[in-house]
Regions:
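Hinge/cleft segment of the Venus flytrap/periplasmic-binding protein
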Residues: 17, 21-23, 168, 254, ...
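Extracytoplasmic "Venus flytrap"
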Residues: 36-59, 68-85, 89, 98-101, ...
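Short, solvent-exposed amphipathic alpha-helices that sit
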Residues: 48-65, 143-147, 171-190, 203, ...
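Structural motif
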Residues: 68-90, 193-215, 229-231
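Hydrophobic alpha-helical segments within soluble ligand-binding/sensing domains
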Residues: 79, 135-161, 203-205, 254-258, ...
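Hydrophobic alpha-helical
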Residues: 96-112, 180, 198-259
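Flexible loop/hinge segments that line or gate small-molecule binding clefts
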Residues: 102-142, 255-263
Length: 314
């Protein structure tokens, strides 16, 4: 199966590359070089992730890049295979959102050896000593602390806290958890239950089903992405509970579907991420690291805490 997946990926890469080269064969100016940005697009778990990918492609094209997009499944193995394929094709730079933060040492060194810089987007990776960190993301811990504060201000802390944890070993999950806990500790609270939903809507629903006997203890739900929050709201609706009244929900992301629920009063607080700015910063960074590949590069996009009452910069 692994060999089949690898062969299928290489075939896909070859087809995409041939189409790309056909486009490059007819530039407006003879022999003009069009820089190529490789983007590893991982299967999206919600509309916010889909919009993020679209914004990244659009920003890259607006900055003069030809985009070579590699869609992959939600596994680190698939991401690494795609990165390696793009290294072989000698794109100017590669942008990707790593599912987890460890396990990238070998491919980082391979990229450096081939002079193809890797830019981690949204989530961070653990660097290696001889490869500089190049990352565009968000200050998740600060956002989480402020979002949790905003949630606790809406109702006096009196109930338990359920955390719908994202992907284990992912930087965003760790930092959101840290920020939320810091805010809770200031109020003398702790996370009552923390269960891993791997960022999936179906798991958000399943976790609440597993917790049915304990839901009366829960007053707050912290969902680390849109998808799990949507799954939790789905379950609450289908079992006669009222999100926004019986349980206050805080989620991190801010896609269209989640914002629609907030307008209906069913999601109390959103830790919103500016994916448009993230995409612009990524395209800017890709231009710069293509010229100076092995210099450290870190930039953070804006975030905001959204409540029904208004918006506060995080």
């Amino acid at each position: 199966m692994k060999r089949w997946k690898g062969a299928a990926l290489l075939l896909l890469c070859t087809v995409v590359l041939l189409r790309l080269l056909q486009g490059l064969a007819q530039p407006e100016k003879e022999n003009a070089h069009v820089p190529v940005l490789g983007i590893v697009t991982t299967a999206a778990e919600d509309d916010r992730r889909e919009a993020q990918s679209e914004a990244l492609v659009h920003a890259a094209e607006e900055h003069g890049f030809k985009v070579l997009e590699m869609p992959v499944e939600r596994t680190q193995e698939a991401q690494i295979e795609a990165v390696r394929a793009l290294i072989v094709y000698q794109v100017e730079a590669i942008a990707f959102t790593p599912l987890v933060e460890s396990g990238w040492d070998n491919v980082l060194r391979e990229a450096k050896s081939a002079s193809v810089p890797l830019l981690s987007i949204d989530r961070a990776i653990r660097g290696v000593d001889d490869v500089p960190l190049q990352h565009i993301g968000f200050d998740y811990a600060s956002l989480a602390e402020q979002a949790a504060d905003a949630l606790l201000q809406q109702r006096m802390p009196r109930d338990g806290v359920l955390e719908l944890y994202g992907t284990v070993n992912a930087s965003d999950a760790r930092e959101i958890a840290r920020g939320c806990r810091e805010a809770l500790e200031e109020q003398g609270l702790t996370v009552t239950y923390s269960l891993c939903g791997d960022g999936m809507r179906s798991r958000g629903c399943e976790i609440l089903e597993e917790m049915e006997d304990h839901l009366d203890e829960i007053g707050y739900i912290f969902a680390q992405n849109d998808a799990m929050a949507l799954g939790a709201v789905d379950y609450l609706h289908s079992h006669g509970r009222k999100p926004g009244k019986d349980v206050l929900v805080c989620a991190f992301g801010g896609g269209a579907e989640l914002r629609a629920l907030q307008k209906k009063g069913e999601v109390a607080v959103i830790g919103a991420l500016d994916d448009t700015q993230l995409a612009e910063l990524t395209a800017d960074a890709a231009q710069q690291i293509a010229k100076a590949p092995w210099k450290p590069y870190i930039a953070l996009a804006d975030t905001a805490v959204l409540t029904e009452e208004g918006t506060a910069d995080a």
